[in-house]
Amino acid sequence: EKIIAEIFKAEDCILTRGSGTGALRYGILSSVLPNEKILVHKAPIYPTTELNIKSMNLKVIEYDFNDLSTLNDTLEDKEIKFCLLQHTRQKPDDSYDLSEVISKIKEIRDDVVILVDDNYATMKVSKIGCELGAELSAFSTFKLLGPVGVGCLVGKKELISKVKKFNYSGGAQVQGYEAMEVLKGLTYAPVSLAIQAIQNEKLVEELSKKEKYPYIKDVFLANAQSKVLLVEFNENIAEEIIEKAEKLGALPNPVGAESKFEIPPLFYKVSGTFLKSDPTLKYRMIRINPNRSGADTVIRILESAYKSIQSKG
């Protein structure tokens, strides 16, 4: 934990049970009491995070962080003492810069405690939330080639100390071989993710060739939770593509998002938060995560799946 705190230039760190969800829960518990107000981005909240919020009966105050011009008005409410930010986008048109949002909040109200959900962002961005001025960052080490079910909360010592008191029981703590597995994962995860990013760039370049792939309307990279390839089709064939791709060797569901168990590419529906913003995307868009596969493998599966649909039609 001391090593991880040093990696992220933080005062302290604790490994938690319950992966990223557990880390977020403890981050909230360190600073918020039941029935208090919590400031969040005006967008669909990640389902497991929403469960944490509902279980404490927190009063959710929404603000669109894509436009900071009226943030001062919202923060005039002195009952708002805590803000939860998500590093990756929650809806397709999100454009806010996390660093700017944190700086603006602190400029207006330095007393507001900020917890950043860095799931899907850690080791993919130059700085996580606690390095940008937030009190806490929470993420899953399972998504970084670490052990199953282990999360990480890193940031201010005062708040981390509270969480350590919550976990005074030895059975609740992460230690021994599990803690070592976290460190092992963190040493290679950046390399693995960098290789994956190169494959994603190759896929965008190749699949953007309209004359070669006329059935594809648009293709782009997005931090739709993980940094993935979003492929929009001209026809409503997304669900069929996913079904065919599974038979051709693709994963139909994530197992922790880029965990050590995921080797084939993932052909999957767009995230629930994206679907809440536009339900029709379910029928014409998919997300593809290469995982440990190369661009050629992804294209082969996509092309074969589409041809299979065409031959059936």
Give the predicted meaning of each segment.
Residues 1-2:
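A glycine-/small-polar-enriched, mobile loop at the entrance of the PLP active site in fold-type I
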Residues 6-193, 197-218, 241-243, 289, ...:
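Conserved PLP-enzyme active-site core in the AAT-like
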Residues 143-145, 221-223, 279-280:
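Short, flexible turn/loop "capping" segments at secondary-structure junctions
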Residues 200, 218-230:
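Conserved glycine-rich beta-strand-loop-beta hairpin in the small C-terminal domain of fold type I
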Residues 212-220, 249-255:
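Short secondary-structure junctions
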Residues 225-306:
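Conserved C-terminal alpha-helix-loop-beta "cap" of PLP-dependent enzymes
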